[in-house]
């Protein structure tokens, strides 16, 4: 086997004794998510809105990457991206996706799965124009997931977009916008000693009712 600086199997972290009981949970997983998200913010966790996004296209080969949560409500969890990126192409072919948050400081993980839909153009525009100018320009300059012949290509495109738009308002690119993932399942995981973690899964029954189940760790 390849030698590594440290054996991955030897890396162990013993979770604290914080428990999670059924009575601790809100009947609504979105409200429960809000409670945990607020606690993570109060714990000053860096990049608290960073989440893994897993997608798979027609070939069923999964891809995963980190994206940023930009909003959530009863309709789902919102993130923004380039529609022509790998994730955008995969979501067009197969809209089912999964999200995961891991806040190690709180020994907590949240898994969410469901169907993603493109947000309205108005919602995408509102968020796009709230971004720093440099981020707006980069959405035009970067053809996400394209193979580049060096950094200079990207820098040249950025310079071109800067000159093109100047001090004028930067329009929303047609290839850029948001997705909203409406959850079918939401799982809350609380780390416990001896790997006997607490896991609760919400499964959607109707638009506004959920079945809550305790799962073996």
Predicted regions and their residues:
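Binding-site signature for planar aromatic cofactors or substrates
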Residues: 1-217
């Amino acid at each position: 086997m390849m030698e590594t600086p440290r054996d991955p199997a030897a890396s162990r972290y013993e979770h604290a004794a914080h428990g999670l009981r059924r009575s601790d949970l809100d009947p609504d997983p979105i409200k429960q998510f809000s409670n945990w998200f607020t606690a993570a913010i109060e714990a000053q966790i860096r990049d608290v809105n960073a989440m893994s996004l897993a997608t798979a296209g027609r070939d069923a080969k999964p891809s995963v990457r980190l994206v940023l949560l930009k909003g959530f409500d009863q309709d789902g969890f919102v993130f923004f991206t380039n529609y022509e990126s790998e994730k955008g192409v995969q979501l067009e072919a197969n809209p089912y996706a999964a999200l995961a948050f891991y806040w190690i400081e709180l020994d907590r993980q949240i898994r969410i799965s469901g169907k993603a839909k493109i947000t309205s153009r108005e919602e995408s525009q509102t968020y796009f124009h709230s971004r720093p100018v440099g981020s707006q320009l980069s959405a035009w300059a970067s053809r996400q997931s394209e193979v580049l012949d060096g950094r200079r290509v990207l820098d040249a495109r950025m310079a071109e977009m800067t000159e093109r738009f100047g001090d004028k308002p930067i329009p929303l690119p047609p290839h850029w916008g948001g997705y909203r993932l409406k959850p079918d399942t939401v799982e809350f995981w609380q780390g416990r000693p001896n790997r006997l973690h607490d896991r609760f899964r919400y499964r959607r029954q109707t638009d506004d009712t959920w079945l809550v189940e305790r799962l073996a760790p």
